[in-house]
Amino acid sequence: AALLPFPAALGGHPLVACGHSMGAYVLTRLASQRPAAFAHLVLIDPVIMDPALYEGESATPIPAPPGHRGAGRRNAWAPAEEMRARFTDRAPYANWDPRVLADYCTYGLLPTADGKGLELACPPALEASVYQNALRTSPHEWLHYLSVPSTLIRAPTGERGGELDFSLSPTWTGLGPAIGAERDELWAEHSHFIPMEAPARVAGLLADLL
């Protein structure tokens, strides 16, 4: 609801909008409620799963974020170069375009409250909460209202090793037909982190729509 006024604040003309992962999930909800604000949606491996996975999840108790693996992420760095050096050879970051990883480490950190170091701009507990609640609100409740032309880009799917395994796609393979996507493409050589691994290819896709 907080984002509903956002498209109008950008000038009022229909937008070509792109979202990745949970960003694409949120974009579908926004576009379903503000269709006139959008000319085209580019949904890159959205965290929109098989409808059956959402059944009964809204009634499931929410575990405390510290019990989630995402809450245990390291959250103290100094300087950003330390973070980049640590991630360069670690999955999934090793497959990212080096420029993207450098930007992530530079702009994904903020000064700590005591000014003695840097911490993640997205607090680990908040990230954990997002994953914990991902199945509690089914996007299939609003997808049938989605009328904006769309392009869907997916990574290969399969049996994932858990909710934080993004070597494979979390996207429901039936999503393209369900929303009437004009293009439904499998980028088989990439993981869930398509924009980070192939920024130039994604940029070219967007440029063709502008």
Each predicted region: which residue ranges?
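Conserved acidic catalytic loop of the alpha/beta-hydrolase fold
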Residues: 1-15
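Short, amphipathic alpha-helical "lid/cap" segments that border enzyme active or binding sites
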Residues: 1-4, 84, 199-207
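Hydrophobic residues on the short alpha-helix immediately C-terminal to a glycine-rich phosphate/catalytic loop
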Residues: 6, 30, 34, 205-209
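Conserved hydrolase catalytic core segment
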Residues: 12-57
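Active-site loop signature of alpha/beta-hydrolase-fold enzymes
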Residues: 49, 160, 193
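Helix-rich cap/lid subdomain of alpha/beta-hydrolase
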Residues: 51-118, 122, 126-137
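Conserved serine/cysteine hydrolase catalytic core
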Residues: 99, 109-178, 183-186
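Catalytic histidine-centered segment of alpha/beta-hydrolase-like enzymes
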Residues: 187-199, 203
